[in-house]
Amino acid sequence: MADVQPTTPLAALSDAARTALGVAGPSVVRIGRAPGRGCGVVVAPDRVLTNAHNLRDGTTAVTFADGRSVQATVVGGDTDGDLVVLEVDTGEAPVLDWAPTLPEPGEVLFAVGRTGDGGDRVTFGIVSGRERAFRGPRGRRITGSLEHTAPLPRGSSGSPVVDGVGRLIGINTARLSEGFYLALPADAELRHRVEALVRGESVARLVLGVGLAPAEVARQLRASVGLADQPGLLVRTVEDGSAAARADLRVGDLITGATGRPVTTLDDLHAALDTVRASRRLDLQVIRGAEAIAVAIAFDEAAS
C-alpha cells in the first residue's frame, strides 16, 4: 500500500488558487476592445459590475470567458464611488457568489482577471491592510478599501478579489506603489449599492452648488481684511438656484462645521453630505464676517 503524503502548505495554496480560478474565472469579463481597459464580474443575470473609470461613455464591449464579445450599456452608475453596472447578455456565465465575511490582515486572497487576449489570470497575495483611502475618478475620497499584495497588471481594475473557494471579497480598483493594490470591500454596504445599480438606480450625491477656497487660502483672505484666523472652507461662488442659494449661503461665508463636526477640508464636507443623503438636510456652522451663524441647507429631488 502506497504511503499517503501529507498535504504541504504549498500544495494547499496551489489547490486553493486552482479552486478560486475555477469558480470565479467564468464570471470574470474583459471590458473594452482588445487589449481592453479593465475587467468586470457578473453579479446578476445580464448584469456586469466594473469600475466607472473603465468606461469612456455609456457603452462598451464585454468579452466573456467563452470568447463571446457583446456590446453592453450602462444601466446604473455611481461615478464618485467608481462603480457602474452594465446590462449585457451574460449567456452561461455564472453569477459570482459573495463571501459572508471579509478577510483579516494576513489572510491569503486571490485576484482573478482576464487577459487582453481573453485568457484566465490568477495571482495570490495577502490582505496587507484595511480601511485604506484613495481618490475616485472625480477626486472624491473613497474610504474603507481593502489593501492587498496579489500582483495585478495594468488593465485589471474591476476584476474580483476572491477567497480560497472563489467567493467575492473585493473589487480591484486602484494601484498603490511598490506592489500594493486597493479593492472596494465586498461588504454589506457595497452589496446594497450594487443591488441598487443592478436595478438601474444610479447613485447621486447631494450638491451644494458652491465654489470653495481651501482652508489655507481662506486664512489668507480673512487676514487680508482684518478678520480672525478660523479653520474652514471659504465660499467663493454660489450658483443661482442651487441649494446653497436657497438657504442664503453667501460669498465670503466661512464653513467651519457640518452636522456638528468640524469642516477643514473638502473631504470633511463630502463626508457630511453623504451622511444626510436620506434626510436631504444639511446643517452648516458658518462664520459670516465675525458672527457665527447656522445655515440649514434643504435639498430638493433635483439637487442630487
Protein language model features and the residues they cover:
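C-terminal cap/linker of serine protease catalytic domains
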Residues: 1-21, 115, 164, 168-230, ...
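Conserved active-site neighborhood of the chymotrypsin/trypsin-like protease fold
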Residues: 4-9, 28, 33-121, 146, ...
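Active-site region of chymotrypsin-like
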Residues: 25-27, 84-97, 121-180, 184-192, ...
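Hydrophobic beta-strand signal
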Residues: 30, 49, 110, 128, ...
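A structural signal for short beta-strand/turn segments enriched in small hydrophobics and glycine
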Residues: 46, 106-112, 161, 166, ...
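Conserved PDZ fold ligand-binding element
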Residues: 47-49, 169, 244-267
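Gly/Ser-enriched beta-turn/beta-hairpin loop segments
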Residues: 75-82, 118, 130-146, 197-203, ...
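PDZ/PDZ-like domain micro-motif
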Residues: 157-160, 216-226, 239-257, 272
